[in-house]
Amino acid sequence: MSKVEFKKETGPREVFCGLTSIVWLHRRMPDAFFLVVGSRTCAHLIQSAAGVMIFAEPRFGTAILEEKDLAGLADAHEELDRVVNDLIERRPEIKTLFLVGSCPSEVIKLDLATVAEKLNKRFLGQVRFVNYSGSGIETTFTQGEDGALKALIPLMESSNEEKLLLVGTLANNVEDRFKKIFRNLGISNIESFPPRQSTELPKIGKNTKVLLTQPYLSDTVRDLKHRGCDIISAPFPLGIEGSTQWFLAAAKAFKIGELKVHEIISPLIKRAKLALESHKEILKGKRLFLLPESQLEISLARFLHNECEMDLIEVGTPYLNKDLMKEEINLLPDNTKIVEGQHVEKQLDRVRNSNPDLVVCGMGLANPLEAEGISTKWSIEMVFSPIHGIDQAADLAGLFSKPLKRNQILTSKTLVTH
């Protein structure tokens, strides 16, 4: 392991809650519906993040907890039953309904697990109900997906059939390219979790080899291990380096030689390196500060330093699972400073004192930092953009070169007021 400096920090934090993950999960599984049991604030958050107007009837919604519910003056369970009945009647195409806990439902101790159990009996054979928490008390941002996948694992049947299981939501076109490469390598039985249809859950067992596509799935990994799955240790497929090591790790697990892997991915690497050059010219030597939000920060830091030659000031991450991130940490330069958790005021002081060229942060911090003359990039864009794989390396670098390029254009000469 490289000589990395680890620090843990606690205090006030500035991150999205786990409800945000509904935005990409509902697109991934079009036969599922995500019902948040929460406040109007929860509803506004998801609707704004998804960019979908509610009259478009998206596959998510919020059962609003009113003041009388929070005060214990009404039976929230009865009201939730009514909402679910109306929803199923209105949307008969729903096959899986996720009951998603929020801060308000956690505060009043609403037992969504029991609610889901009762609803499963009532709607047996029609709709499947599962529950998880997206509460900001318990989760941050991407951990919502971890909770959703963990909730589905008990529903997955057992099988000893050998297969490669890609775990973590990917853009469909990226996933299709990955599967094509694996088939060219000779791995024919490949499935994904979450699947594209919520009712088509993969079967798992002792011959299931799990390859993670996202670094924020600690609980999911633990439960898959308990089901006997073998977890392949690898960096994550961000950039040329990470994706190459990711493919090599999968090939090794299936006893496929490295030469075969390089033969198949070499043309992709050659094209990606050429496409990366223009972004590298802008990013090279620039100082980068990553604030914690998505748990992608360590992988992004590795890519931006090793392939784009940026200098790392500090790499923040909401949580750090050293087992899952071991291969990533090994690729970081010596003396990289990784800070787990957050005390937002202290971290902002370090940002100002270090004079970075670019700060990767949440939307809530971006505008104030921009007002201070500090260039920023929203971390949420990394989750909503198709950034995985060798052939996406230039697009990934472009997300970071764009704000720096913008600043080069918006000089004091172009910002003259009349």
Curated annotation (Swiss-Prot):
Pathway(s) where this gene product acts: Porphyrin-containing compound metabolism; chlorophyll biosynthesis (light-independent)
Molecular functions (GO terms): 4 iron, 4 sulfur cluster binding; ATP binding; metal ion binding; oxidoreductase activity, acting on iron-sulfur proteins as donors; oxidoreductase activity, acting on the CH-CH group of donors, iron-sulfur protein as acceptor
SUPFAM superfamilies for this protein: Helical backbone' metal receptor
GO biological process: light-independent chlorophyll biosynthetic process; photosynthesis, dark reaction
EC numbers: 1.3.7.7
Cofactor binding, note field: Binds 1 [4Fe-4S] cluster per heterodimer. The cluster is bound at the heterodimer interface by residues from both subunits.
Pfam families: Oxidored_nitro (PF00148)
Membership in a protein family: Belongs to the BchN/ChlN family.
Record-given protein name: Light-independent protochlorophyllide reductase subunit N
Organism this protein belongs to: Prochlorococcus marinus (strain MIT 9301)
Gene that encodes it: chlN
